[in-house]
Amino acid sequence: MKLQADTLRERIEPLFLENFQRFGELGAALSIWQEGQRLFDLRGGFRDTKREQSWTEDTIVLVWSATKGIGSGCLLHTLQENKIKIDRRVSEFWPAFGQGGKMDVTIAQMVSHSAGLCALDENVEVTDYEAVIRAVEKQAPLWRPGSAHGYHARTFGFLIDELVRRVAGTSISKYWRTIFAEPLSLDFWIGLPEELNSRCATIYPARAETARAPVKFYRDLITPGTLQRRTFTSPYGLNAVSAMNKPENRAREFVSFGGIGSATALAKFYAMLANGGQIDGRKFFGDDALKLMTTTVSDGLDRVFEIPTAFSAGLMKDAAKAERNLFGPSANAFGHPGAGGSHAFADSENRIGFAYVMNQMEQSVLPNDKSLRLVDAMYL
């Protein structure tokens, strides 16, 4: 399908504005690309609840787990450049990882949330990278790797960051800046420089409301000792949304949940992936790496979310039994949402890159109507 920028904007803009009028959006931005070209951007609202700071072209915002998609892209590029297949064992490159019965865990299992490492037995702080890595190394899988999958909310970023460090000799944050962000002028950071805090929108927690679906997940999330509670609180710390508005925490390289940037940057990155791995006259990914992004590795009931989810090599896909598509109608679409409403993906079949970011979170584990109505309208 070929999108026409003018007619698409006429269809999308009223829905975008309706997010503020009907759905309680505070500030937000949207960016849609096709075939490596930007079709249009939209932005509106405010960076703060006092409504004193308008959301402008240079506003950036925390996107929580949408950062995982960026991190996964960096890992897959690292594997591509070093000719490493994802069926290789993690312990080949990270020997201490093999402790606790993990010697045969593959990269594919690790990046598809099926390694059974979503929670840690050792009580370590999320800000202490080395302590978290040591705890990961000692951790025994919580289920037989490859037999099931469950969302690795916090540990995922540490797992892929350490593997990139072992193979490429640098952190994902630095790899991202060098390989993608600087060459493509992408306004997205994993570890925000202090001088950019003045451009940041404040992120606000979801308003108190009756728990939305999946009800069982939300009930288990607040129950001590459950897998859900352990997953979202280990490694521990920075569980309050407000903590991530502090400059010292924005500066931390949290690959699982700390990325800060613009909708335009996210959409352009996914537009590159959707466009055969190339954009602006540069090619970043070959066919083999792109196939890893579109090919489902794990699909079915997620042990953490307790609903069907699916993952390729680090990217989320629509589950076969999902109640609603998150990434449009194409089976080849992939991406990663963020807590509360941010959403970004690539549709390689139609060469589309999409991103929606916001600062007023909603109580939802997956993208909500504010972004999904826009996705649906894009394919009318």
Predicted regions and their residues:
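Active-site-proximal alpha-helical segments within enzyme catalytic domains
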Residues: 112-113, 156-163, 253, 257-279, ...
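Short, charged, amphipathic alpha-helices and their helix-cap/turn boundaries
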Residues: 42, 124-145, 170-187, 239-242
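Active-site helix/loop module of the DD-peptidase/beta-lactamase fold
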Residues: 57, 62-66, 80-122, 138, ...
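Short, gly/Ser/Thr-rich active-site loops of penicillin-recognizing serine hydrolases
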Residues: 254, 275, 289, 294-301, ...
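Flexible glycine/proline-enriched surface loops and loop-helix/loop-strand junctions
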Residues: 56, 139-146, 156-158, 246-255
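Short, conserved catalytic-motif segment at the N-terminal edge
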Residues: 2-63, 83-88, 134
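Alpha-helical scaffold elements that line and support the substrate/ligand-binding pocket
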Residues: 36-37, 62-84, 110, 152-180, ...
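Active-site Gly/Thr loop motif
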Residues: 202-258, 263, 291, 295-349
